A protein has these predicted regions:
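A structural signal for short, well-ordered beta-strand segments and their strand-loop junctions
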Residues: 47, 54-56, 123
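Alpha-helix capping at helix-to-loop junctions
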Residues: 29-33, 59-62
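Blade-terminus and WD-like Trp-Asp/Gly-His loop motifs, strongest in beta-propeller folds
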Residues: 1, 45-52, 134-141, 183-189, ...
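A flexible loop/linker signature enriched in serine peptidases of the S9 family
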Residues: 4-22, 38-42, 57-110, 125-131, ...
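Short loop/turn segments that connect beta-strands within beta-propeller blades
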Residues: 27-31, 115-119, 163-167, 212-214, ...
Length: 266
């Protein structure tokens, strides 16, 4: 299953400012790709959760939601008004621009769940919440790090858990005093890299924590980097800096002049 842009009908919709993403299937033994389905959002990533797909979508609050409007005068009027105002931008948030992303004012990354049996697709994260990282645990659980703001973005992040089968959204770590990098479930317990940023400030290295019943506990007072910071503007590849199985986290660390792979056993 992959994302592509080959359907003329949807190409026309996207030319008219509608957000659609088309998905195709390709037999691993050969043959042509076949159109599978389309969702009325701008999806950029997908992860499988049982018989459903967890989609990372780009959502623009500046635009009218044309993809969900019925064809008619209301939709035509909304499109006309949007096109007439495209020669200027209103900045009413901080930050309104980001390096490598361009204008980010009123733009968020959100999560949607697509049901491959019914064909329904629904955004499952709150309005104006920006999802910064997400992980699918098993067939039914999504962990994600987010920042909720409507005027000025906070330096702190929260950790949430969404249960696909029930639609329940639970806040595990409040967005009030931590920076969070990576989260997973190890041996049945939510475990994450994070920092209170009290010793060295914003770029302070992470420590390893667990959270249960709203209580955050230090698991390891680790003080080295949990990322590969040995790089330059010209490099061959990039990818995730941490992965996990049921028992351990495997991550890249920077030690002086070299990067190494380390593990944590929860």
């Amino acid at each position: 299953l992959f994302i592509a842009d080959r359907e003329k009908a949807y190409q026309e919709k996207m030319k008219n400012e509608e957000d659609w993403t088309c998905f195709y299937t390709l037999n691993i033994h050969g043959g042509e790709a076949q159109f599978a389905f389309a969702v009325p959002y701008k999806a950029v990533k997908m992860k499988k959760a049982g018989k459903k797909l967890v989609l990372t979508v780009k959502y623009d609050y500046n635009k009218p939601d044309l993809s969900h409007m019925e064809e008619g005068e209301e939709k035509k009027a909304a499109l006309k008004a949007w096109k007439e105002e495209k020669d200027y931008e209103v900045f009413d948030e901080l930050p309104f621009w980001a390096n490598g992303q361009g204008i980010v004012n009123k733009k968020r990354t959100r999560l949607a769940v697509y049901d491959m049996e019914s064909g329904s697709c629904e955004i499952v994260t709150p309005d104006y919440e920006n999802v910064e990282s997400s992980w699918v645990e098993g067939d039914d659980t999504i962990l994600y790090v987010s920042s909720l703001y409507t005027d000025k973005k906070d330096v702190y992040q929260g950790l949430k858990q969404y249960t696909v089968s029930t639609g329940e959204l639970e806040t595990l770590v409040e967005q009030k005093d931590m920076s969070i990098d990576y989260a997973c479930i190890l041996k049945g317990k939510v475990t994450f890299f994070g920092s209170y940023m009290k010793e060295y400030g914003f770029n302070e290295n992470d420590k390893l924590y667990t959270v249960e019943d709203g209580k955050v506990e230090l698991l390891s007072d680790y003080d080295d980097s949990v990322h590969n910071s040995i790089c330059c503007d010209c490099k061959f590849a990039d990818g995730v800096s941490a992965v996990h199985d049921e028992d351990k986290i495997y991550f890249i660390a920077t030690l002086r002049k070299q990067s190494v792979i380390r593990t944590f056993d929860a």
